[in-house]
Amino acid sequence: MLDSIIKILFGSKHERDIKAMLPILHKINEKEAWALSLSEEEFKAKTDEFRERYQKGESLDSFIPEAFALAREAARRILGERPYDVQILGSLVLHSGKIVEMKTGEGKTLMSVAAAYLNSLTGKGVHIVTVNDYLAERDADWMRPVYSYLGVSVGVILSNMENDARRIEYNCDITYGTNNEFGFDYLRDNMQMRLKDKTQREFSFAIVDEIDSILIDEARTPLIISGAAEDDTQRFFEVDRLIGQLKEVEKNPETGEYPNELEGEEVIGDYTIDEKSKRVSFTDSGMLHIQDILQRQGLIKSGNLFDEENFEYIHYFTQSVRAHVLFHIDVDYVIQDGQVQIVDEFTGRVLEGRRYSDGLHQAIEAKEHIKIAQRNRTLATITFQNFFRMYDKLSGMTGTADTEAVEFTKIYNLDVVVIPTNLPVARKDEHDVIYLNENDKFEALCTEISEAYKRGQPVLVGTVSIEKSELISKLLTKRGVRHEVLNAKNHEREALIIAEAGAKGSVTIATNMAGRGTDIKLGGSPEMRAKKRTGTNPNPDYYEKVLAEEYAKWQSDYNEVKELGGLYVIGTERHESRRIDNQLRGRSGRQGDPGRSKFFLSLDDDLMRLFGGENLKNVMSKIGMRAGEPIEHPWINKSIEKAQTKVENRNFDIRKHLLEYDDVLNEQRSFIYEQRNAILEDENLIERIYATLEEFISEKFDEYSSSSKAEKEERARLIKDIFREKFSYTLTEEDFANIDKKNHEEEINEFVEHFTKELKEKEALAGKENLNMFIRYQYLQAIDKKWLDHLENLESLREAVYLRSYGQKNPLTEYKLEGFDIFYSMLDDIRIEIASRLVRVQISTEEEAHASRQMRSIQGNAQHNSMGSFSGSGHGMGPTALSARSRPENAQVVRTVPKVGRNDPCPCGSGKKYKYCCGKNG
């Protein structure tokens, strides 16, 4: 293998990448005999030595030859598998922070061991990211003995774990988990009220398995933690029963295009749809029709559709039309246990726990006449794009990445390196065959499957939806072809079905579920057959005996299937992405095995219909092609690839555009989370309050003093209101006269002194630690509340700026400018809110509290709080409440009562400030 790699001369970028790593590979191979001579104790001792050297300043790169040799030898001793040179090269690529493209069956899981081991030596933790819990747990269990032999701990994060268990797993040297769990834990950590409740460490190094699936396919789907919002479920039912009265705009029969309403062309219908982007737009007449429908139904009591109280009906109608016209059962979603479950278009799997946002999920539930779940409010959100960009070093592996190399470079600054296979690929990829219509296509491919079935060649049929997989199943049943169906409805049998997909005579119809994380062996799986015979928890000796028998039988089956040509992969439709097609092809021809692949297409397929089918249809008409006749030519393949490239470029632009918007939110989120963490760690929050309050007041006074004469009166009123309502502090005309002269340092100092004195009094009664706990809770509560409101404001802004493009304005620029304006406004609100809460909280003596309790009892107040707590403006103490044990003697916190501020007019009626009158000696 090494000799064949050395022969690579100047060639493609990938060949040059490989050539540059060969000297390091030589050094690793030279250390193999040294590693072979070490005992298990010496392996662990070497790991400790590496850690110590790293802490003293040596780089990880200086350990590569020895560390990789140790990892390779540990795998050989524990698993009986010695990583090939190509796997070592792949691990070098991972360590360098790049993406490895390695074909299916070449051992990506084993390839990651050396890179993960080397980077675990930093003590900062390594995250290995998989697409589901099953793979995370399987890979962790499989590789844990290897890492343990090296003296490295391994953890795994699963969806059903509690916080304490997660923290333990994250503190391991290497942690396996899914992209969802890592992302959600980040969001949950930044919602915690106590530092000790956080689970994750810093984001140092991540290896992402199936990285193209996570960073490309799921890039447009943000992670969202949500809570209950207002209940508007009845509106979805109301609108759903009315939606049948609306009609799609009639298209021009010659061009297949909608008439242009802006150019005065006649429009017949209420709405237009864009299947590519799944958008719905109402015409002017459609809007009036909706208004008329709502008025006749009595749903609009007064005014018109565009009045503020009625305008949201447009949103309900939009989502309802989308649900009926653009989202289809057994294609986009399935119904299981009375719930709408989303089907991943790329994997064919049910996305458990995921819901369409913005009311679309509720609209689909109304369409399907099942119980509508209440809409949720976003509490925290992040995209995978911005989550994974937080890692100091990011790498990944997949069987298909090269087609998206440009996007990986531009968005993530990740290079893609293609690693050659250990053995040459022997699969034969045939030209596509294309038919005029779908019926002809299905008839032809069922004939092809039947012929392969008769000769015993295993067949894997790839479909794009559950609906199509079930249709082909019915057609094959009529022909007497025994087969298995694998889709989101029967995913629990996935392991068993895939294990036998390479057996002689097997026919497997699968959605894209069969495209990832699976390894189809020719002749079937002897391990699965042995487990089936021995049952669960068999006697080890008996299991080994049965396994040996199955292996002997499998060897004969394997040779027979090889003679038949290996696994025959048949695609029933081209996907929008070439990667998905390549994944399907990659099920066949693993590790030098023979194989065959072929796609059967028609002009009715979505890709052909939406992206370039008209050109092909015209060509086929000119050459006199008839129904039932196929066409097979390299030109067809090029034309289809061109259509796919067009879609890929379009989808890349969409993802890039979404990221540009999300970067605005990401910058703001990072700032808020940094502030939150600082507050969790700060043991002297009073000083932070003083500083932020002084800064805020100074800004407000500066705004007043620098404003024009016409603006001054309004600004003075606003500042007075803030000080009176939030701080119980009155600013006089004399104060504003000084501020106007830009001589407001005295006023600032006076206010801060007043505020400081009040807090010192409260600190003396409550105790510094308890007051700090209270301030922390109130601070975090204020941040969280304002941040949630801000997320909603940004979402509304994003929808609003979209329309400004019609006014020749750049929506993104508008979003950035206004987004940061409302962000800074939110920061002001937080500063005011926390200071206001501290001003209003009251602390009284035990005697006063006792008298107050007696008075409440006399008045018949049934509410009783057995735990003394801070309270102010209705804000409870929450988890940091002062208990009787922690409270200083004779001190108790009770509910807020009206009080006179030192700068308020004295209640005696003298006209003087309270501090200069009756409060002089207070």
Curated annotation (Swiss-Prot):
Compartment(s): Cell inner membrane; Cytoplasm
UniProt KW Translocase keyword: yes
Membrane topology summary: Peripheral membrane protein
Pfam family, one: SecA_DEAD
Top-level taxon of origin: Bacteria
Protein name: Protein translocase subunit SecA
Region (Disordered): 850-891
One GO MF term: metal ion binding
GO-annotated cellular components: cell envelope Sec protein transport complex; cytosol; plasma membrane
Assembly mode: Monomer and homodimer. Part of the essential Sec protein translocation apparatus which comprises SecA, SecYEG and auxiliary proteins SecDF. Other proteins may also be involved.
Reactions that this protein is recorded to catalyse: ATP + H2O + cellular proteinSide 1 = ADP + phosphate + cellular proteinSide 2
Residues the record lists as binding ATP: 87, 105-109, 519
Similarity-based family: Belongs to the SecA family.
Enzyme class: translocase
EC number in record: 7.4.2.8
InterPro entries: Helicase_ATP-bd, Helicase_C-like, P-loop_NTPase, SEC_C_motif, SecA, SecA_CS, SecA_DEAD, SecA_motor_DEAD
GO biological process, alphabetically ordered: intracellular protein transmembrane transport; protein import; protein targeting; protein transport by the Sec complex
Residues that coordinate or bind Zn(2+): 906, 908, 917-918
Known function: Part of the Sec protein translocase complex. Interacts with the SecYEG preprotein conducting channel. Has a central role in coupling the hydrolysis of ATP to the transfer of proteins into and across the cell membrane, serving as an ATP-driven molecular motor driving the stepwise translocation of polypeptide chains across the membrane.
Free-text cofactor note: May bind 1 zinc ion per subunit.
Cofactor(s) named in the record: Zn(2+)
Principal location: membrane
Keyword list, A-Z: ATP-binding, Cell inner membrane, Cell membrane, Cytoplasm, Membrane, Metal-binding, Nucleotide-binding, Protein transport, Translocase, Translocation, Transport, Zinc
Alphabetical list of PROSITE patterns matching this protein: SECA, SECA_MOTOR_DEAD
Protein's UniProt keywords contain Protease: no
